[in-house]
Amino acid sequence: MVTGTVKFFNRIKNFGFITGDDGKDYFVHVSGLKPGITITEGDKVSFEATEGERGLKAENVETQ
């Protein structure tokens, strides 16, 4: 699991980015959030880092 902070999340477009504690930015889509989880800018989160077609992606995101 990787930890990080939500950089931004657009609820209308259902995506955003998380800056990992490793300094890398991860794309997150609403489908990558664990059920019942909502995130907003500044939230501390943990997630599984994966490699998507366009780069790093966060899956199974949950708040800490």
Give the positions of each predicted feature:
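Structural detector for short beta-strands of small beta-barrel domains
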Residues: 1-10
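A generic beta-sheet turn/junction motif
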Residues: 10, 21, 51-53
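Short aromatic-glycine-enriched beta-strand elements
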Residues: 13-18
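Beta-strand/loop nucleic-acid-binding surfaces
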Residues: 24-37
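Short nucleic-acid-contacting surface segments enriched for D/E, G, S/T with interspersed K/R
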Residues: 34-46
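OB-fold/S1-family single-stranded nucleic acid-binding modules
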Residues: 50-64
